[in-house]
Amino acid sequence: MKTIITLALLFLINIVGAQTIKSIDDLEPSEAFDNIQVQKIDSDSLSTTFAIWVKLKVKMHKHVNHIENVYIIEGNGEFTVSDSTYKVRKGDLIVIPKDTWHGVKVSSKKPMKVISIQSPEFKGLDRVFKED
């Protein structure tokens, strides 16, 4: 019986410890930056979540093995996905299939702040930048 109770407690501790709650309003760049600042919020084998601030642009690139969901918290600009360009602003969600070229040009005075969720876990190994 002790074994069952111990296993149950360990299971509950693991579940509770695996959850993360962050206030989006409290996320701020950790230091001064020229163009892009990235903060990892959470990661496991299934996905990685980042807070990203962009002052000017993110060059066209793709993730060979990852899908990416980008939710705009602040700012606006032009987001290109494949051959289409969209005007984007606070509250927009961009869904980017794996192996799809994408990038953004910021037009707001304040940096664009986004939440980026990539699946599976992002380790930076499959990001390919498009040559100019």
Where are these regions (language model features)?
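A short, N-terminal "cap"/entry segment at the start of jelly-roll beta-barrel domains
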Residues: 5, 15-51, 59, 129-132
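Short, conserved beta-strand element in jelly-roll/cupin
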Residues: 53-55, 64-79, 117
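Short acidic-glycine-tyrosine-enriched beta hairpin
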Residues: 84-98
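Sec-dependent signal peptide recognition
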Residues: 1-8
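Ligand-binding loop in jelly-roll beta-barrel domains
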Residues: 100-124
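Structural motif
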Residues: 57, 76-78, 85, 101, ...
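Short histidine-centered beta-strand/loop micro-motifs
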Residues: 52, 59-64, 105-107
